[in-house]
Design a protein with these regions (language model features):
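Outer-membrane beta-barrel biogenesis signature
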Residues: 1, 146, 181-190
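Surface-exposed coil loops of outer-membrane beta-barrel proteins
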Residues: 1-49, 118-123
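Aromatic-residue hotspot detector
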Residues: 18-20, 46, 160-163, 190
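Short active-site-adjacent structural elements
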Residues: 30-32, 75, 158-161, 186-190
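Detector for outer-membrane/organellar transmembrane beta-barrel domains
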Residues: 44, 51-178, 182
Length: 190
C-alpha cells in the first residue's frame, strides 16, 4: 500500500543475500470518516508491526524472494467488537536471466481493506473483510536498451453479510503493456 506512515524499522546486515526487516509503525484509524484512512485518534491505541525477510542471489540467473507481514490491533469499531487485529501477508519472487526479468507477487489480508491501509477493512458490524491480490510482470531489454514489458495485477475485497448493495469496490485489475527507452541515466521515454 502506498499510504504514508511514520515508522521505526531495523534491517539486519546482508548475510550472504539473506536479510530481515522489523518495524513498529504509526497506528492507523480504521473508523475515521472521510475518503481515506486516517492517522488521527480513535482506534489508534496500539502501534502496528511489520516485517519482511528476503533472500537475494547473483549470477547468470539472479533473483530475489521475499515474504512479509503487517499486524495492527484495531479497537472501537463497534461496542460489541471492542478489539480485533488487522493482518496481512505477502510473498514475491523476482528473477533475471540475460535480458529477461520476471516478477510474481501475491498478498492476503483480513481487516486491511483496499486502496489505502485499513480503508474499508471492516463492515458496519465490525466484521473483517478479506482481501487478496497480486501481480505478474515480464520485461525484456532489447540490444538498443529499450525495455519492453507487460504486467497484470488484481486486488480483491470480499463482501460480508452487512455489505449487500453498498457499492463497495469488489475488484480492481490493471493490464499494462509498455516500451521504455532511456534518454539519460534518470529519464525514460515511455
Amino acid at each position: 500500500y502506498a499510504d504514508w506512515n511514520g515508522q521505526i524499522a531495523y534491517t539486519t546486515p546482508n548475510m550472504n543475500g539473506l536479510s530481515f526487516t522489523l518495524g513498529v509503525m504509526q497506528p492507523w484509524n480504521s473508523t475515521a470518516s472521510g475518503a481515506v484512512s486516517d492517522a488521527s485518534t480513535g482506534s489508534t491505541d496500539t502501534f502496528g508491526f511489520q516485517g519482511q525477510g528476503s533472500y537475494s542471489w547473483t549470477g547468470d540467473f539472479a533473483g530475489k524472494i521475499w515474504a512479509g507481514f503487517f499486524q495492527q490491533e484495531v479497537t472501537g469499531i463497534t461496542a460489541a467488537n471492542s478489539s480485533t487485529d488487522a493482518t496481512a501477508f505477502e510473498v514475491g519472487v523476482s528473477t533475471s536471466i540475460y535480458n529477461i526479468n520476471l516478477v510474481a507477487y501475491g498478498y492476503s489480508g483480513e481487516g486491511v481493506g483496499t486502496t489505502a491501509l485499513l480503508r474499508d477493512g471492516f463492515d458496519t458490524a465490525g466484521n473483517k473483510r478479506d482481501s487478496d491480490g497480486g501481480y505478474v510482470q515480464a520485461t525484456y531489454v532489447i540490444p538498443t536498451g529499450t525495455k519492453l514489458g507487460v504486467s497484470y495485477g488484481v486486488s480483491k475485497l470480499d463482501d460480508n453479510a452487512a455489505d449487500a448493495g453498498d457499492g463497495l469496490v469488489k475488484e480492481n485489475t490493471m493490464l499494462t503493456i509498455g516500451a521504455y527507452h532511456p534518454l539519460t541515466k534518470h529519464l525514460n521515454l515511455v
